[in-house]
Amino acid sequence: MTHPPPFIAVIPARLASTRLPNKPLADLGGKPMVVRVAERAREAGAQQVLVASDAQSVLDAARDHGFEAVLTRADHPSGTDRLAEVAAAFGWRDDTVVVNVQGDEPLIDPVLVRDVASHLAAHPACAIATAAHPIHDAADVFNPNVVKVALDAQSVALYFSRAPIPWSRDAYQPHWPDVAAMPAPAFPVYRHIGLYAYRARFLRTYPSLAQAPIEQAEQLEQLRALWHGERIAVLITESAPEAGIDTPADLARVQALFQPGSK
């Protein structure tokens, strides 16, 4: 087995979730959610796992289970900004690979985390790596909550959008705007997976980058990097990852998986 290059996993976690308050501390089989996520990051082979939060209760929960935790400001507009604060505080080398593991994804596959980190290490011209998988359902292509990514010949991101990209003129135009009548895509359409690996150099510069008009329009923060000329390498996987936890119903579904005897 080939060992992955060294990488650091940072788990940004905040309590102020509008749909699910205190989400990082939700119990999953006797452990807080943020700890379950940290365990997945450790299984991925991260040389360092950090929980980053503005809430002392989250830091205490992580430390009680043997994980390193760091206090961050409460006014960060995104998880990337929180990572940027951590990168600046620790003074990591420019080429250090830092993976943002979302704090509400306790079922994330450690192999995917490791592979995205390795993908960035293998693409020195890129500042960021992420992942995507093929879409086979036309409903997903036209769903604005499903973010699509268009790629170049080297699987580097050209653009991310909530709109259906690429638009197939011949396949879609005859049916527009009847989305229900749209055929399944006969060409590669990729759904973006919100897992990112960054070079520490980029994280330190990120807070100084002005927001991009396309970022504000689409409400996709990764477009800021493209707008400012950074390259994003995209790892193609065959299937979608397990969904994260956003609502009480999501939490109940995942809690059931952590019950004794569940598979």
Swiss-Prot record:
Localisation: Cytoplasm
GO MF annotations, alphabetized: 3-deoxy-manno-octulosonate cytidylyltransferase activity
Matching SUPFAM superfamilies: Nucleotide-diphospho-sugar transferases
Cross-referenced InterPro entries: Cytidylyl_trans (IPR003329), KdsB (IPR004528), Nucleotide-diphossugar_trans (IPR029044)
EC number: 2.7.7.38
UniProt key word Cytoplasm: yes
GO biological process: CMP-keto-3-deoxy-D-manno-octulosonic acid biosynthetic process; lipopolysaccharide biosynthetic process
Catalysed reactions listed for this entry: 3-deoxy-alpha-D-manno-oct-2-ulosonate + CTP = CMP-3-deoxy-beta-D-manno-octulosonate + diphosphate
Keywords: Cytoplasm, Lipopolysaccharide biosynthesis, Nucleotidyltransferase, Transferase
Keyword Heme set for record: no
EC class (word): transferase
Pathway assigned in UniProt: Nucleotide-sugar biosynthesis; CMP-3-deoxy-D-manno-octulosonate biosynthesis; CMP-3-deoxy-D-manno-octulosonate from 3-deoxy-D-manno-octulosonate and CTP: step 1/1; Bacterial outer membrane biogenesis; lipopolysaccharide biosynthesis
Gene Ontology terms: cellular component: cytosol
Record-linked Gene3D superfamilies: Spore Coat Polysaccharide Biosynthesis Protein SpsA, Chain A
Physiological role: Activates KDO (a required 8-carbon sugar) for incorporation into bacterial lipopolysaccharide in Gram-negative bacteria.
Family of the protein in this entry: Belongs to the KdsB family.
Protein name: 3-deoxy-manno-octulosonate cytidylyltransferase
UniProt organism field: Burkholderia cenocepacia (strain HI2424)
